[in-house]
A protein has these predicted regions:
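Active-site-proximal helices and loops of the catalytic beta/alpha 8
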Residues: 13, 22-37, 41-44, 48-56, ...
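Short coil/turn segments at secondary-structure boundaries
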Residues: 272-275
């Protein structure tokens, strides 16, 4: 009782093998009506590389040595689609987001990021409809993955429509560019932003005796007027566990930093599951191996 639900919304990219098997009746898949003969078209949902066959990174083996019924080492995609991190190549490297494909919000990336927002792009409508669908299911908020890789104009347009369904619903932006913080709050209409690049990064160094508290007042000063919009944390699925050998090896070392994170201003604070008991993120878990994290690529209990 009293528990609320915030779900992850990934607006920038989908899986390369994306196909919805649970969409409502009458709803078309992303890309279903795309003109794949051109690299960019404002009404397309994806970006394409006409005439080029997608090739996975050399020596990449899906699932490693593990066997699976779907593991036949074959994957056909022609024309190739652009990766989630904007790589216009049919042969992305292993460190690119090769297993994802970029969603097209009407931005012609190859033409100096020229925008085509009138008429409203198809991707805007489809992604807004997904948000509204879940708002109607009474979720309490969305953590928006890589929100800054999606045009702020989309958020300005979409968020009020979702809040018309539920005015109390909250939007949290994963964002790593401090110069865009105010833009995504004021124009984009987000409620909260990740406070990773400044406060988290500084506190991590402090926990390991690699920095000074002297940097913190300057960070807070740079956030004048928006401090209460910054979501503070010491752990999330992307970052290493405090108790992991790759971080501090002892979660009690982070106690002073947790006090700062929770009490430095009126911004919300996030505690990642297992943080309260010193989860060390130990053990190999698939793609990323022994990395001090829990579920960055692989989900386990």
């Amino acid at each position: 009782e009293g528990m609320k639900v915030i779900i992850d919304f990934v607006p920038n990219h989908v899986a390369r093998a994306y196909k919805s098997d649970a969409k409502p009746a009458g709803v078309k898949d992303l890309g279903e009506d795309d003109d794949t003969s051109v690299s960019f078209k404002a009404s397309n949902n994806f970006y394409y590389l006409p005439g080029q066959q997608f090739q996975p990174p050399a020596n990449y083996s899906a699932l490693g040595p593990n066997a699976a019924p779907t593991k036949d080492k074959k994957y056909s995609e022609n024309p190739a689609k652009v990766t989630g991190n904007d790589q216009f190549t049919a042969t992305p490297g292993i460190n690119e987001w090769f297993e994802t494909i970029k969603l097209n919000y009407g931005v012609d990336i190859q033409d100096n990021r020229k925008t085509h927002f009138d008429p409203v792009p198809s991707t805007w409508v489809k992604m807004k409809d997904i948000l509204v669908y879940w708002a109607n299911k009474n979720v309490d908020g969305f953590r928006c993955d890589m929100a800054e890789m999606v045009p702020v104009e989309f958020w300005h347009w979409a968020i009020p429509q979702v809040k018309a369904v539920n005015p109390e619903i909250i939007f949290i932006a994963e964002i790593y560019n401090p110069s865009q913080y105010r833009n995504y709050l004021e124009t984009g209409r987000f409620d909260f932003l990740y406070d990773k690049v400044q406060l988290y990064d500084t506190l991590r160094l402090l926990i390991n005796n690699q920095s000074s508290t002297a940097h913190i007042p300057g960070i807070q000063k740079s956030l004048d007027g928006i401090n209460h919009n910054m979501l503070h944390f010491l752990e999330n699925h992307d970052e290493q566990r405090i108790a992991s050998p790759q971080f501090s090896g002892d979660y009690w070392k982070a106690a002073p930093a947790m006090v700062i994170s929770a009490m430095i201003d009126k911004g919300p604070v996030m505690i990642y599951f297992g943080q309260e008991v010193g989860e060390p993120g130990a053990g190999k878990e698939g793609f990323n191996g022994e990395d001090g994290r829990t579920t960055i690529f692989d989900y386990w209990g």
